């Protein structure tokens, strides 16, 4: 545990004491070494958890998410270099400090044993994210996006705190390791239903559930590149992880209470996919596609079967890497043509052929082409939801079709077609960008060879 936390804390002096010319190379290489040390966490000889201390542990569910969090920091630092180029050194260093703080909170959130500690760290991730969005975003609307993000998350999370304090007083402990050993079934009453709602709502807002998703497109569109990456790749996964952890306590109630939410997810999944077909703004399209993918994860978790949990974990990891890569690609377009409108960027295949290769790979992963882990996740979710109700196959099949449509629509609109007349002196694709894309793509390709390390605790 400390072999990850202490080097992460040491990134602060590395950032602030590095020479100005060495800031990027030092932080990137240091954070990459931390993420390689974290690979040891993925080794679970048995299906048990590794208990580092009384407060922190990792198990087959949290270790893939931990690995994703650690892998993302060097990528965010690499992606941010261009848009911070004209900022003064102090601001560059404070931006990096925010990213490192966020990384530290996220690592501890995924490792927490106590649910109250998990809640505190879950809320703490809000602060650095908010500062990144409202300070380094592009347009003035970033303040509005920050307000949405803050109030949606806070309003959703307050009932969870009350519910956790109530559970603590009634059960005596909220330790995740012991709680399922002496768990009493919750009584079947309306107050239990309220407790279930209070516990689940915070994670539903974070995921986000269709209907509570309005903060997500705003936050994604206005955030700088690192903000978008960490938001899509890790912060949405906090919701899924929290739901998997807390549904253990709410055992029999979920079966009856999940119906309206399952309906809403299946409906919202198709709605948000359809919205993607009508988008002109590239970042907004990727944000809405995140909502539709996360709806699948909510379905998988609420059906409450081992296969569902496996599918949800696989889909979360796959989506984390894929959507982060899509945001990087959108950002590399934005740095060249200074517009997020897709039609403005058409015909880039002739100018940047290598970037088109990355666009193709990212789009194919997004539409879950075999044998990607996106497909493995989606298949497991489909099997799970089919066991719950046969009709869901039609809805999930329709969603897969629309996902394929908007992924290819995005690819064709940005890469094919005639060049717009004002694109004549573009920068070529940089080695930094190609490295960044390959570092997103390689884990996705390698995981197709051995997906069981990210299939969670039930494999």
UniProtKB/Swiss-Prot annotation:
<dbReference type="GO" id="GO:0006120">
    <property type="term" value="P:mitochondrial electron transport, NADH to ubiquinone"/>
</dbReference>
<dbReference type="InterPro" id="IPR000260">
    <property type="entry name" value="NADH4_N"/>
</dbReference>
<dbReference type="Pfam" id="PF01059">
    <property type="entry name" value="Oxidored_q5_N"/>
</dbReference>
<keyword id="KW-0496">Mitochondrion</keyword>
<keyword id="KW-0812">Transmembrane</keyword>
<keyword id="KW-0830">Ubiquinone</keyword>
<keyword id="KW-0813">Transport</keyword>
<feature type="transmembrane region" description="Helical">
    <location>
        <begin position="308"/>
        <end position="330"/>
    </location>
</feature>
<keyword id="KW-0249">Electron transport</keyword>
<comment type="similarity">
    <text>Belongs to the complex I subunit 4 family.</text>
</comment>
<keyword id="KW-0472">Membrane</keyword>
<keyword id="KW-1133">Transmembrane helix</keyword>
<dbReference type="GO" id="GO:0008137">
    <property type="term" value="F:NADH dehydrogenase (ubiquinone) activity"/>
</dbReference>
<feature type="transmembrane region" description="Helical">
    <location>
        <begin position="224"/>
        <end position="244"/>
    </location>
</feature>
<feature type="transmembrane region" description="Helical">
    <location>
        <begin position="147"/>
        <end position="167"/>
    </location>
</feature>
<feature type="transmembrane region" description="Helical">
    <location>
        <begin position="284"/>
        <end position="303"/>
    </location>
</feature>
<keyword id="KW-0999">Mitochondrion inner membrane</keyword>
<feature type="transmembrane region" description="Helical">
    <location>
        <begin position="257"/>
        <end position="277"/>
    </location>
</feature>
<dbReference type="GO" id="GO:0048039">
    <property type="term" value="F:ubiquinone binding"/>
</dbReference>
<feature type="transmembrane region" description="Helical">
    <location>
        <begin position="60"/>
        <end position="80"/>
    </location>
</feature>
<feature type="transmembrane region" description="Helical">
    <location>
        <begin position="95"/>
        <end position="111"/>
    </location>
</feature>
<dbReference type="Pfam" id="PF00361">
    <property type="entry name" value="Proton_antipo_M"/>
</dbReference>
<keyword id="KW-0520">NAD</keyword>
<protein>
    <recommendedName>
        <fullName>NADH-ubiquinone oxidoreductase chain 4</fullName>
        <ecNumber>7.1.1.2</ecNumber>
    </recommendedName>
</protein>
<dbReference type="GO" id="GO:0032981">
    <property type="term" value="P:mitochondrial respiratory chain complex I assembly"/>
</dbReference>
<dbReference type="GO" id="GO:0005743">
    <property type="term" value="C:mitochondrial inner membrane"/>
</dbReference>
<dbReference type="GO" id="GO:0015990">
    <property type="term" value="P:electron transport coupled proton transport"/>
</dbReference>
<feature type="transmembrane region" description="Helical">
    <location>
        <begin position="22"/>
        <end position="42"/>
    </location>
</feature>
<keyword id="KW-1278">Translocase</keyword>
<dbReference type="InterPro" id="IPR010227">
    <property type="entry name" value="NADH_Q_OxRdtase_chainM/4"/>
</dbReference>
<feature type="transmembrane region" description="Helical">
    <location>
        <begin position="194"/>
        <end position="214"/>
    </location>
</feature>
<feature type="transmembrane region" description="Helical">
    <location>
        <begin position="342"/>
        <end position="362"/>
    </location>
</feature>
<keyword id="KW-0679">Respiratory chain</keyword>
<comment type="function">
    <text>Core subunit of the mitochondrial membrane respiratory chain NADH dehydrogenase (Complex I) which catalyzes electron transfer from NADH through the respiratory chain, using ubiquinone as an electron acceptor. Essential for the catalytic activity and assembly of complex I.</text>
</comment>
<feature type="transmembrane region" description="Helical">
    <location>
        <begin position="391"/>
        <end position="411"/>
    </location>
</feature>
<feature type="transmembrane region" description="Helical">
    <location>
        <begin position="113"/>
        <end position="133"/>
    </location>
</feature>
<dbReference type="InterPro" id="IPR003918">
    <property type="entry name" value="NADH_UbQ_OxRdtase"/>
</dbReference>
<dbReference type="InterPro" id="IPR001750">
    <property type="entry name" value="ND/Mrp_TM"/>
</dbReference>
<comment type="subunit">
    <text>Core subunit of respiratory chain NADH dehydrogenase (Complex I) which is composed of 45 different subunits.</text>
</comment>
């Amino acid at each position: 545990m400390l072999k990850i936390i202490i080097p992460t804390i040491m990134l602060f002096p590395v950032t602030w004491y590095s020479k100005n010319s060495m800031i990027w190379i030092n932080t990137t290489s240091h954070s990459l070494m931390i993420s390689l040390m974290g690979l040891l966490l993925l080794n679970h000889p048995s299906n048990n958890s590794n208990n580092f201390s009384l407060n922190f542990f990792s198990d087959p569910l949290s270790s893939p998410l931990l690995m994703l969090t650690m892998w993302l920091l060097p990528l965010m630092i690499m992606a941010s270099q261009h848009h911070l180029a004209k900022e003064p050194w102090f601001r560059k260093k404070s931006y990096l400090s925010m990213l490192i703080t966020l990384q530290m909170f996220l690592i501890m959130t995924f490792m927490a044993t106590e649910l109250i500690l998990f809640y505190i760290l879950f809320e703490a991730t809000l602060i650095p994210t908010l500062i990144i969005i409202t300070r380094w975003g592009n347009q003035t609307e970033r303040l509005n996006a920050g307000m949405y993000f803050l109030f949606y998350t806070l309003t959703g999370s307050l009932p969870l705190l009350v519910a956790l304090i109530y559970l603590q007083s009634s059960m005596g402990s909220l330790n995740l390791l012991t709680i399922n050993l002496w768990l009493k079934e919750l009584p079947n009453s309306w107050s239990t239903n309220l407790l279930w709602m209070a516990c689940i709502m915070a994670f539903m807002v974070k995921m986000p559930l269709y209907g509570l998703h309005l903060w997500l497109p705003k936050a994604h569109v206005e955030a700088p590149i690192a903000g978008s990456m960490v938001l899509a790749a890790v912060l949405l996964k906090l919701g899924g992880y929290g739901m998997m952890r807390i549904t253990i306590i709410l055992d029999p109630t979920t079966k009856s209470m999940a119906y309206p939410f399952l309906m809403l997810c299946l409906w919202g999944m198709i709605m948000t996919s359809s919205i993607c077909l009508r988008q002109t703004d590239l970042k907004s399209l990727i944000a809405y596609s995140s909502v539709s993918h996360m709806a699948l994860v909510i379905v998988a978790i609420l059906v409450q079967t081992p296969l569902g949990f496996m599918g949800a974990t696989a889909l979360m990891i796959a989506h984390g890497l894929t959507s982060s890569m899509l945001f990087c690609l959108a950002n590399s377009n934005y740095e060249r043509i200074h517009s997020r409108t897709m039609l403005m960027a058409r015909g880039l295949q002739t100018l940047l052929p290598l970037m088109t290769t990355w666009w193709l790979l990212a789009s194919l992963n997004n539409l879950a082409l075999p044998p990607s882990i996106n497909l493995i996740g989606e298949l497991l979710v489909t099997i799970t939801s089919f066991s719950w109700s046969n009709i869901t196959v039609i809805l999930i099949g329709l969603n897969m079709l629309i996902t394929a449509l908007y992924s290819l629509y995005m690819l064709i609109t940005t890469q094919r077609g005639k060049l717009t007349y004002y694109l004549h002196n573009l920068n070529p694709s940089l080695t930094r960008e190609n490295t960044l894309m390959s570092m997103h793509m390689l884990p996705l390709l390698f995981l197709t060879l051995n997906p069981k390390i990210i299939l969670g605790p039930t494999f």
